[in-house]
Design a protein with these regions (language model features):
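Charge-rich amphipathic alpha-helical interaction elements
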Residues: 1-155
Length: 155
């Protein structure tokens, strides 16, 4: 798409008006880009922290691997994940709310005694995993918005 110049007073006034608008809005767009860059950096650090925590939790329970063979994984399921929307640096982003789990009743007399602790462990692991995935998705949204804003600055 080539820019066509017209050498008349009206088109010159239109170009000057567009230039003034771009010059006036450039500091705002640069500030938005900077805020988005900071948010991306912060979110990336949060994702790394959550992934490290998840790996640490999994490593801590490696000794119980043989016991998990008798555990019924259908005892606990994620029922719902609450989301809300929040505007951060001019971008609408989802915010993670509560995570609701459905725990199927089981007999504490017939089941092994560690199943209650196993359910809590699975809740913890699922919560950390969902939070990490959610933060990763949030980081992708922010990075996309940052790239678009950078394109506007570079115009």
């Amino acid at each position: 798409m080539a820019i066509r110049f017209q050498y008349n007073k009206t088109s010159l006034q239109q170009q000057e008006k567009a230039l003034k608008m771009r010059v006036r809005t450039l500091p705002t767009i640069k500030a938005k880009e900077s805020a988005l860059r900071q948010q991306v950096k912060h979110t990336k650090m949060e994702v790394e922290r959550l992934e490290a925590r998840l790996e640490e939790e999994l490593r801590g329970y490696q000794g119980m691997v043989r016991l998990w063979g008798e555990f019924d994984p259908s005892l606990i399921t994620v029922q719902s994940v609450e989301l809300s929307m929040k505007k951060i640096a001019g971008v609408m982003l989802p915010v993670l709310g509560d995570i609701h789990y459905e725990i199927r009743p089981f007999s504490i007399f017939n089941a092994p005694s560690w199943w209650a602790e196993g359910i809590e462990l699975l809740k913890t692991l699922a919560t950390v995993g969902i939070e990490a995935e959610f933060q990763r998705l949030k980081m992708e949204f922010l990075d996309h918005a940052r790239r678009k804003t950078t394109q506007k600055v570079n115009l």
